[in-house]
């Protein structure tokens, strides 16, 4: 191949030795040509010539005498590229589609032996001389079997994930045991929290009071540490950590041995609240002891379920709603905040699977417009999976009571980070409404709703919720692996709601650093228990 530019600059000639491109001339009037035009021409040719060279070489190697240059070009690059399909190919495609349509409605014979792999299918075709229809039928049966196996594997994966999410990791169990032992042997671990001179602060409304109910010591440490480190006024922070009787010693030890000064921490067990008696919480006592309820949360999660008509996502939601934590008193405590803290006017209630990234003190300045609950709504937002929750997502609207009292299109709101006006709350019947609907659902054998503790709260707080800006509380980090990282960085609170908690191995690796940032890996108890190693 040669490129020749005439001395007069009137023509550019391209020629090839094999006559694939015999001659190409670009003629230009001398008086109109400019160096810029020439430069652009040569630049275009620099991109074009390698392609022409390769194409010429291919044609030469394949044999240029067997076809014309353009015909070879079309044949080598494929008829579809040039939009040409010969009649025989069209007939073959039509016949194959016809066979597929016939086979799609045909019954697959019982006992049909299916190949284990595609290579075995090809081998069987050769050995048994399959016609096209037999091949299509066997191939369809193979695909359907593969789909069934894949579906069963997906449900098995979801079940295993459910059990993993409900279990206690070895490291966290170790941490609780070691801290409990420390409480019994170390007087400093038993020191009063807070110190006696700071006790009046626990009921002082000039401070910012946070309530955290959890039996997870590691999670509690992250919530408290992230709040203190993100605050512009840590000296104004008071944390009321509520736990159960078995975790109390370990929880107390942690905060006694790991000060978050100047913030103040109080640790109490549910058995230390005089108000929490069986007389005041009879419904929850019934929920915890009712056999059908216990079987629902602890029994066989697949028995009675029609998996053929259930999508994996729906099944995952049902499994999440059957977490044993939903029959724990700790998970219902927020409904009793006005009684548990009779001297406080406002509190922020936090779940233990959140991380605080910004100063939350402005929450106390938000005007709730006479409402009780400041919360982020979950029916609108960029993430349509996480932020598309309406009442229809939580309730069974085929139940007459639900259909009568609720609107399926009403926007839902989120637990996890809520600002509660306790003074206004005490003037309402929210607690009584909550108990009443719990009783109704218990009577109906859990046919009104099945997803945890939020549904009765959605009813009880109806008309008492003030929406707050969504930037205060970002949800979904425990089940949405495609969480927008930039939005997560900007959110005041990020919430790992869902099964993939950051302290579990099933947590999302790329979302875990937001949480581990506040884990004190230099702590001896953390190191000795090999947390998240």
Curated annotation (Swiss-Prot):
One of its GO terms (biological process) is pollen development. Residues 62-533 are lumenal. Disruption phenotype: The pollen tube growth defects of plants lacking TOD1 are partially suppressed by gaut13 mutation. The gaut13 gaut14 double mutant is defective in male gametophyte function; swollen pollen tubes disturbed in elongation, and characterized by a disorganized outer layer cell wall with an altered repartition of pectin (e.g. homogalacturonan). It is found in: Golgi apparatus membrane. Its EC number is 2.4.1.-. The lineage of its organism: Eukaryota, Viridiplantae, Streptophyta, Embryophyta, Tracheophyta. It comes from the Eukaryota. This is Probable galacturonosyltransferase 13. Pathway: Glycan metabolism; pectin biosynthesis. GO terms for cellular component: Golgi apparatus; Golgi membrane; pollen tube. Residues 1-40 are cytoplasmic. Glycans are attached at residues 306, 396, 445, 520. Expressed in roots, inflorescences, siliques, leaves and stems. Accumulates in pollen grains. The gene is GAUT13. It is an enzyme of class 2 (transferase). Keywords: Cell wall biogenesis/degradation, Glycoprotein, Glycosyltransferase, Golgi apparatus, Membrane, Signal-anchor, Transferase, Transmembrane, Transmembrane helix. The chain crosses the membrane at residues 41-61. InterPro entries: GAUT, Glyco_trans_8, Nucleotide-diphossugar_trans.
């Amino acid at each position: 191949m040669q490129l020749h530019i005439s001395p007069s600059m009137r023509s550019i000639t391209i020629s090839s030795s094999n006559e694939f491109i015999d001659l190409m001339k670009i003629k230009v009037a001398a008086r109109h040509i400019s160096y810029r035009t020439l430069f652009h021409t040569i630049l275009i040719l620099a991109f074009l010539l390698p392609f022409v060279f390769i194409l010429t070489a291919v044609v030469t190697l394949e044999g240029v005498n067997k076809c014309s240059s353009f015909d070879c070009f079309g044949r080598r690059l494929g008829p579809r590229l040039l939009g040409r399909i010969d009649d025989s190919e069209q007939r073959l495609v039509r016949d194959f589609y016809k066979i597929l349509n016939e086979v799609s409605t045909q019954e697959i014979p019982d006992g049909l032996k299916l190949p284990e792999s595609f290579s075995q299918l090809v081998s069987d075709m050769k050995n048994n001389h399959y016609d096209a229809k037999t091949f299509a039928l066997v191939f369809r049966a193979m695909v359907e079997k593969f789909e069934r196996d894949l579906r069963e594997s997906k449900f098995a994966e979801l079940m295993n994930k459910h059990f993993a999410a409900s279990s206690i990791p070895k490291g966290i169990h170790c941490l609780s045991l070691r801290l409990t032992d420390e409480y019994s042997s170390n007087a400093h671990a038993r020191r009063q929290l807070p110190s006696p001179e700071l006790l009046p602060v626990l009921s002082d409304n000039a401070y910012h009071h946070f309530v955290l109910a959890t039996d997870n010591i590691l999670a509690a440490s992250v919530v408290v540490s992230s709040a203190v480190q993100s605050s512009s006024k840590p000296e104004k922070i008071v944390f009321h950590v509520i736990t159960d009787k078995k975790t109390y010693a370990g929880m107390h030890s942690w905060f006694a041995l790991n000060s978050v000064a100047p913030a103040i921490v109080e640790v109490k067990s549910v058995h230390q609240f005089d108000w929490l008696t069986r007389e005041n919480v009879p419904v929850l006592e019934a929920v915890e002891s009712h056999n059908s309820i216990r079987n629902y949360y602890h029994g066989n999660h697949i028995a009675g379920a029609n998996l053929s008509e259930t999508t994996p996502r729906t099944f995952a939601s049902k499994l999440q709603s059957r977490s044993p934590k939903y029959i724990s008193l700790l998970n219902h405590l927020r409904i009793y905040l006005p009684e548990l803290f009779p001297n406080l006017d406002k509190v922020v209630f936090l779940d233990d699977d959140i991380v605080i990234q910004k100063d939350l003190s402005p929450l106390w300045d938000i005007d709730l417009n006479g409402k009780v609950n400041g919360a982020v709504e979950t029916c609108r937002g960029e993430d349509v999976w996480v932020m598309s929750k309406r009442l229809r997502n939580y309730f069974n609207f085929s139940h007459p009571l639900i259909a009568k009292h609720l609107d399926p299109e009403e926007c839902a709101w989120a637990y996890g980070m809520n600002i509660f006006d306790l003074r206004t709350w005490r003037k309402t019947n929210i607690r009584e409404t909550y108990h009443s609907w719990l009783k109704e659902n218990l009577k109906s054998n859990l046919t009104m709703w099945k997803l945890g503790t939020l549904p009765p709260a959605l009813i009880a707080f109806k008309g008492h919720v003030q929406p707050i800006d969504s930037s205060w509380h970002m949800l979904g980090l425990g089940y949405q692996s495609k969480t927008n990282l930039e939005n997560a960085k900007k959110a005041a609170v990020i919430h790992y709601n869902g099964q993939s908690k950051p302290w579990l191995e099933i947590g999302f690796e790329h979302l875990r650093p937001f949480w581990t940032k506040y884990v004190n890996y230099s702590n001896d108890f953390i190191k000795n228990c090999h947390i998240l190693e």
